[in-house]
Amino acid sequence: MQHETKMENQSWLKKLARRLGPGHIVNLCFIVVLLFSTLLTWREVVVLEDAYISSQRNHLENVANALDKHLQYNVDKLIFLRNGMREALVAPLDFTSLRDAVTEFEQHRDEHAWQIELNRRRTLSVNGVSDALVSEGNLLSRENESLDNEITAALEVGYLLRLAHNSSSMVEQAMYVSRAGFYVSTQPTLFTRNVPTRYYGYVTQPWFIGHSQRENRHRAVRWFTSQPEHASNTEPQVTVSVPVDSNNYWYGVLGMSIPVRTMQQFLRNAIDKNLDGEYQLYDSKLRFLTSSNPDHPTGNIFDPRELALLAQAMEHDTRGGIRMDSRYVSWERLDHFDGVLVRVHTLSEGVRGDFGSISIALTLLWALFTTMLLISWYVIRRMVSNMYVLQSSLQWQAWHDTLTRLYNRGALFEKARPLAKLCQTHQHPFSVIQVDLDHFKAINDRFGHQAGDRVLSHAAGLISSSLRAQDVAGRVGGEEFCVILPGASLTEAAEVAERIRLKLNEKEMLIAKSTTIRISASLGVSSSEETGDYDFEQLQSLADRRLYLAKQAGRNRVFASDNA
């Protein structure tokens, strides 16, 4: 049983090998190599892409941290000022100058505009409007018991604001704006008549209105983008502000205004000059503030669709990246600014960078390897194909007679034995025909060997055309042929032999110019039906004996028995 399984496996492998062929195997091997090389290259591309994304995020994080650090410093100053203001509201300093300031306020509070100054070199002036103007505002009110304390606290904060404000700071203006109709600012109001306009410019700004107890329930620091309160100045500003509360009462707002141009300059200074890419700053509503690119100081390179995609991506995380056409956009929310910093890196910038050089080198290596692989495939495929053709030709020549194109003696015997064994296994008859051309030596002697070769070739063609599909014919001697008929009885084999004899004898063939001859053959037939013997050599010997009986009986005959 194990032997049968082994034979079946070998047979299956042989069939597969015949079906595939060496060329198909070469193709398959090269396809596998190409697929694996492409897979490895793709894996390298994925790793390179991850490294590129990490690099983009690291560059963005460095700039964001630098900007955040500077903004945090200003936020910390604002919190410090609010704490000082709260302390001053609860426990004001008992200075004569401060008491005089309260008295002066009581004297001028009904005036349309007023200013209180203690010492211009030490503190800032308090600028205010009348009770009548305050009463017209919805958010404004002087109905609080600590109004005097707020006046003195504003003067104290003015002293701190003067100390905190310097030319190297990002902050252009720091101010305290009270709901009670006055303000303190590091930008002085030169003329009293300008106080109402400036005050109402403050209290109508989003950074003031947005700190009402309804709008800012958590009383936290907030950032706003707005136009300045001065009509002559059209440059947008970013204002950080915080409400001032004490005993659950909202007194006013402390704020610091930072011009966008200042943030733009700081953004440029924070960027490594050797790095490509554009940095853009947006507020919480994705409104463009500034850019590090001098060519787009007030531009926006994103269309509405791209801004919508960016906003959708920002909903799920505080940092990330997204591809937009040929650009890679990375973004990170700032900790101390209600906005987001965006880095835009274009394809051309990426190609010029280190990752671009590596990508180009990787692509060229893959292309070179693939080209060499294809050339190798073509050369080896041609070599294998030529060798296969040569092998097939040599194998054919080893198994066939080149003149008659029939099997030679060795090949015929190799074919006959397994066919005889198969017929014996299935109890089918197995027959053999021996054919010998009559007077062939005379043809050679009279017309030459070339004519003899033509006769042999002509006879082989007629014999082949007379056989069944499963029959096998071969040349076993000079003018002798042998035909194997698996599954044919003695009678059927005799009929085939007679058909061969008639075809050979009926057709004339041209030997030389104006010379034709007619050939004949003597045939002997044997079959396993007679003795039950399936030995091919025995059957061939028996058929050969009957062939010579046919020659002795006068040639051009078929003998299927020793008596006929």
Curated annotation (Swiss-Prot):
Q: Positions of the site: Transition state stabilizer?
A: 441
Q: How does it sit in the membrane?
A: Multi-pass membrane protein
Enzyme class, spelled out: transferase
Annotated active site: 479 (proton acceptor)
Cell compartment(s), UniProt: Cell inner membrane
Pathway linked to the protein: Glycan metabolism; bacterial cellulose biosynthesis; Purine metabolism; 3',5'-cyclic di-GMP biosynthesis
Q: Give the EC number(s) under which this enzyme is classified.
A: 2.7.7.65
Could you tell me one molecular function GO term of this UniProt entry? GTP binding
InterPro entries, per the entry:
CHASE7 (IPR033416), Diguanylate_Cyclase (IPR050469), GGDEF_dom (IPR000160), Nucleotide_cyclase (IPR029787), Rev_trsase/Diguanyl_cyclase (IPR043128)
Highest taxon above the source species: Bacteria
GGDEF domain sequence ranges: 428-563
Name the Pfam families on file. Answer: CHASE7, GGDEF
Q: Which residues bind Mg(2+)?
A: 436, 479
Cofactor(s) the protein requires to work: Mg(2+)
Q: Which CDD domains match?
A: GGDEF
Keyword Secreted attributed: no
Give the cofactor note.
Binds 1 Mg(2+) ion per monomer.
Against NCBIfam families, the record matches this protein to:
GGDEF, PRK15426.1
Quaternary arrangement and interactors, per the entry? Homodimer.
- Protein name stated in the entry: Probable diguanylate cyclase DgcQ
Which species expresses this protein natively? Escherichia coli O157:H7
